[in-house]
Amino acid sequence: MDAEKMLEIDGSYLEGGGQALRNALSLSCILGKPVRVVKIRASRPSPGLSHQHLHGLNLLRDITNADVVGNYLLSSTVEFTPRTILDNTYRVETHTAASITLIYQMALPVLLFAGRPSRLIVSGGTNVDFAPPVEYMQEVLLPNLKHFGVSFDLKVQRYGFYPRGQGRCQLDVQPVTKLNSGKLVAFGRIKSVSGVAYCAGRLPVNIAIDMQQTAQREIHRLWPSQQCSIEPIKHSRQKAFHNGAGILMTVNTTSDVVLGASALGKKRIDGHVLGSEASCQLGDYMRKQVCVDDYMQDQLIIYMALAVGRSTMRTGKLTNHTRTAINVAEQMTGVKFDVAMEPGGQMLVSCKGLGHVNKLI
């Protein structure tokens, strides 16, 4: 590899987690730009590539037939030189509880620029800490990406929780010619507040019911006239082998705004606490009338950077994940993001996208 032609990304920027690596590699694949990522996950207790990041890296290597240096566990530097994006059926077996959704987060934007539809089957954790739950990807990410002209189908074949994992999902991706600009700035009126409270394994359904009742009670306390429908679910042994519990709540508005809030059970699971946590978070979004929630911010940056025309989102205080994503996108694409605070405290984030065109279709 020619080191002089390789763009270098500092993986320790701000939060120093995996965000810089994920976005840099995805953009490298899409744009055909070699990249070197250094100081990977420098701020984490175990710096360097984790199992999840290594699986994602090797997946992108396969998708683009890339040359890679540094693809081993705990590696702090990776050099990645992609070739063309290959549509195919890809399988990733993590053999751990590595996050399925974070692996999808790396691959989805890349497969959008393949020549034909692709399928990606991944085993690992569907609902694990420090990652979006799979329900969030289905119920919140998908409708948000529809603003950019993106379509995908995500099926959960089996749920998997920490520490054993063993979940399995299938993602089918339709390629695009280009990404439309997204305008997520008008909150509109609330149409519905809904969600799912789930438990699995040896955990009793009462935990899901506790989450449901507390979440609904909290929403009704804050908005007495607002209907809130949470479905309690106990997953069968065929659908989820091991213990796990959590809740995802969403709000849908007349302006096609979809916001999500979730909570995940840890070792000692209290359904009332989880229900309160998710409903309070969602209630805060509703009160501030943001159009993009805190966990969607960073995921939209790569699509805004690549889209044709100017994209804008109204959100809350920018997370370090989002600031990192902006930093990487600006270096990789040359676009400029504008961030302004509004009188109500919301942040308006916009950029004129690169207008990247899929030449494989």
Curated annotation (Swiss-Prot):
Protein's recorded name: RNA 3'-terminal phosphate cyclase
Q: Name one GO biological process term.
A: RNA processing
- What family is this protein classified in? Belongs to the RNA 3'-terminal cyclase family. Type 1 subfamily.
Q: What is the lineage of its organism?
A: Eukaryota, Metazoa, Ecdysozoa, Arthropoda, Hexapoda
KO phenotype (gene knockout): Severed axons of RNAi-mediated knockdown class III dendritic arborization (da) neurons, display increased regeneration.
* Principal place of residence: nucleus
Which segments does the entry list as coiled coil?
none
Query: Could you say which EC number(s) this protein's record lists?
Result: 6.5.1.4
Does the record bear Glycoprotein in its keywords? no
* The protein's enzyme class: ligase
The species is Drosophila melanogaster
Where in or outside the cell it occurs: the entry states: Nucleus, Nucleoplasm; Nucleus
Write down the chemical reaction(s) this protein catalyses: a 3'-end 3'-phospho-ribonucleotide-RNA + ATP = a 3'-end 2',3'-cyclophospho-ribonucleotide-RNA + AMP + diphosphate
Q: According to its UniProt record, which residues of this chain constitute the active site? A: 321
